[in-house]
């Protein structure tokens, strides 16, 4: 694991402390101002605190070496954490939209002054937290999900500032639930790709590889007659696993090993596959297709 894609203990402590502070400030601010946007953001930040803890624990578990019970290691722990965080974000966003619609149907007065001050504090703290997590978020799905949690809160708080100014100047209280709805829609828009990628990895969906081109390149190796029974999946967002059956001319095992090495080098260098497993055959499966469709022969 690269250190720049992990939360250090200090970052974890700072982000958690900032989120706890924001939660308390926004909860009190929401109660005293009557702002649904602040109250919803407070609960959102509370969820963020839990997501940061979950992400940190998962990143530590992911550092564990493989063992007889987890032969591929523990990297999937971070994918599971990303999945949970993404689901939580979408559920919270849906709840906020429902509550905002209720507030639109039954408007309530909002103290724009308190709302503005609290939103400014929340925005600054959230942007600091997002900055702390930004390093490594591009290459780590777990950190990306957590980073999106915090960034969505920062944008939410910024939206609340705009809403508070409008309420303070023009007394348009209805802007409070409207801002909440807009921010919630944005959160779902940003979170959906993370959820989709996490589901694909957990379901062992094939990565974006050109399998026909891979087969064509493998068939160029002298002695390779056919390639079939291909499987490709990802352990995490960075590591691709690949297995295939290859039909070879009948020859000594000592002559097969150089073919293995050449094919492994090809797949690793050209297609960025991290782990290659090849099964050599002579007659079995010689006319089979690239992919098996038999559920009993996966």
Say what each PLM segment does.
Residues 1-14, 37-39, 43, 51-298:
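Alpha-helical transmembrane segments and adjacent TM-loop junctions that form the membrane-embedded core
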Residues 15-25:
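The first (N-terminal) embedded transmembrane alpha-helix
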Residues 28-39:
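Short, hydrophobic transmembrane alpha-helix segments
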């Amino acid at each position: 694991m690269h250190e720049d894609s992990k939360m250090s203990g200090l970052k974890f402590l700072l982000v958690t402390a900032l989120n706890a502070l924001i939660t308390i400030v926004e909860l009190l601010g929401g109660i005293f101002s009557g702002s649904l946007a602040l109250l919803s953001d407070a609960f959102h930040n509370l969820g963020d605190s839990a997501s940061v803890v979950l992400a940190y624990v998962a990143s530590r578990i992911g550092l564990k070496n493989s063992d007889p019970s987890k032969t591929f290691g523990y990297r999937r722990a971070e994918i599971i954490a990303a999945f949970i965080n993404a689901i939580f974000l979408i559920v919270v966003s849906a709840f906020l939209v429902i509550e905002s619609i209720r507030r639109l149907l039954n408007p309530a007065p909002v103290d724009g002054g308190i709302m503005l001050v609290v939103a400014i504090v929340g925005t600054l703290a959230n942007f600091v937290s997002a900055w702390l997590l930004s390093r490594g978020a591009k290459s780590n799905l777990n950190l990306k999900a957590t980073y999106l949690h915090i960034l969505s809160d920062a944008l939410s708080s910024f939206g609340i500032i705009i809403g508070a100014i409008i309420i303070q100047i023009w007394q348009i209280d209805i802007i409070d639930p409207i801002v909440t709805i807009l921010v919630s829609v944005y959160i779902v828009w940003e979170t959906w790709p993370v959820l989709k990628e996490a589901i694909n990895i957990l379901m062992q969906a094939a990565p974006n590889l050109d399998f026909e081109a891979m087969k064509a390149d493998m068939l160029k190796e002298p002695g390779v007659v056919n390639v079939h029974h291909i499987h490709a999946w990802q352990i995490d967002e960075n590591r691709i696993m690949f297995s295939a059956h290859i039909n070879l001319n009948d020859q000594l095992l000592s002559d097969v090993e150089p073919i293995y090495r050449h094919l492994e080098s090809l797949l690793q260098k050209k297609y960025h596959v991290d782990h290659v497993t090849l099964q050599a055959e002579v007659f079995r499966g010689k006319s089979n297709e690239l992919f098996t469709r038999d559920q009993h022969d996966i």
